[in-house]
Each structure stands twice: as structure tokens, then as C-alpha cells.
Amino acid sequence: MGAMQTQALGMVPMVIEQSGRGERSYDIYSRLLKERVIFLVGPVNDYVANLVVAQLLFLESDNPDKDISFYINSPGGSVSAGMAIFDTMNFVKPDVSTLCTGMAASMGAFLLAAGAKGKRFSLPNSKVMIHQPSGGSQGQATEIEIQAREILKTREQLNKILAERTGQPLARIERDTERDYYMSADECKEYGLIDQVISKRA
């Protein structure tokens, strides 16, 4: 269940803080946002991307010099929504540190690799999966041809970025993303998608 669905059911824990002015309650995600922690949980779509982008921009305006932590547990989803997050991660001034909890697949893995170099992490039992973008089309033959060309261009764009982020040769990225390619946390580090596997907070 995604964070937003959980919130809709009223199951998000509340945190109560004491201050000189009395008590204040926050939902847990708002409290963690104060600590500069953003979550991507569940599928990547336009709604989720809009929330993540807004949080990145807010945290940049709050403190442009302090790192942002981005926790990812996602099966992937829309390429255009994912690219909106990717571009904003690079656009904002603070470094964005990424951490895989559970699974980062498809666009989730792409965003995991998009973290600041040296600040991309995974918990030890997490899984990561990369593959080529998929899409379906219908309509006239010419429309299907246009869509197919666009998917091929997108695949080329994503592969080039992955090669740059991992240090792997483009030919290997192209070969590995031809089908679903699963990695353990340690294999993910060896591949260059992350920089470190962590089991305890330093």
C-alpha cells in the first residue's frame, strides 16, 4: 500500500512534539520532511512525481546547502514522471542522497542511481532491477511506428544516463537492460548503481 493510500485510510502515525509554546502534532511524513527526508513508495506516476518535486524545491528553499535524503521503495512506473524527479534532483542545489529500502525497480532503480555520487546507498536485503522501457500503442500503422521510434529514443536516452551514472560501458547497459536484470545490494554496488551497502546508521 502506498503512503498516500495509507494516509487516506487514516493509518499514518502522528508524532507529538513538545515546545515552549505547547504541543504540536505532525503526521510522520511531515515530521520526517522537517529532517529533510523524502519518500518514494509505490509506482512512479505524475501525482507522486509532483509531490516529490515540490518537496525537493521546498527543501532547497529551506536550506540550499544541506543534503536531502531520498528513500526509495518502488517498482517503477512512468518514464516522463521519473524524468521530472531526475531532472529536479539535478536542478536543486543540495546534494540528494538516495537509499533503497526493499526494492528499486525500473524507474525506481534509475532514480536510485541518480543520487549524488558517493551518497547512493542500499540496505543489505534490498533488490534492484533494471530493464528497458516498455509501452503499448494502438491506432494506425503510422501512429504505432511513431510510438515505437519514441520508445527506442527513450531507451537510448536512459541507457546513456545509466552508463554515465554507473561507469559501465554503454554496450553492457544495453545488453543488461534488454530483459529484467535483478541485482542484490552487493551486486548493485559492484555494478555502480550505488556507492555503499549500509546495515547500520553511522
Curated annotation (Swiss-Prot):
* Active site feature: 106, 131
Top-level EC class as recorded in UniProt? hydrolase
Q: Which residues form a coiled coil?
A: none
UniProt key word Cytoplasm = yes
A single cellular component GO annotation: endopeptidase Clp complex
Q: Which GO terms describe its biological process?
A: protein quality control for misfolded or incompletely synthesized proteins
One Pfam family recorded for the sequence: CLP_protease
Quote the EC number: 3.4.21.92
Q: Does the keyword Protease apply?
A: yes
The main location class comes to: cytoplasm
Task: Tell me which domain of life the UniProt entry assigns to the organism this sequence originates from.
Answer: Bacteria
Instruction: Report a single Gene Ontology molecular function.
Output: ATP-dependent peptidase activity
Cellular localisation: Cytoplasm
- Chemical reaction(s) catalysed: Hydrolysis of proteins to small peptides in the presence of ATP and magnesium. alpha-casein is the usual test substrate. In the absence of ATP, only oligopeptides shorter than five residues are hydrolyzed (such as succinyl-Leu-Tyr-|-NHMec, and Leu-Tyr-Leu-|-Tyr-Trp, in which cleavage of the -Tyr-|-Leu- and -Tyr-|-Trp bonds also occurs)
Q: Which UniProt keywords apply?
A: Cytoplasm, Hydrolase, Protease, Serine protease
- Similarity field: Belongs to the peptidase S14 family.
Q: What does this protein do?
A: Cleaves peptides in various proteins in a process that requires ATP hydrolysis. Has a chymotrypsin-like activity. Plays a major role in the degradation of misfolded proteins.
- NCBIfam families per the UniProt record, alphabetical: clpP, PRK00277.1, PRK12553.1
Describe the protein's quaternary organization and the partners it interacts with.
Fourteen ClpP subunits assemble into 2 heptameric rings which stack back to back to give a disk-like structure with a central cavity, resembling the structure of eukaryotic proteasomes.
Name of the protein this chain belongs to: ATP-dependent Clp protease proteolytic subunit
Q: Which organism is it from?
A: Albidiferax ferrireducens (strain ATCC BAA-621 / DSM 15236 / T118)
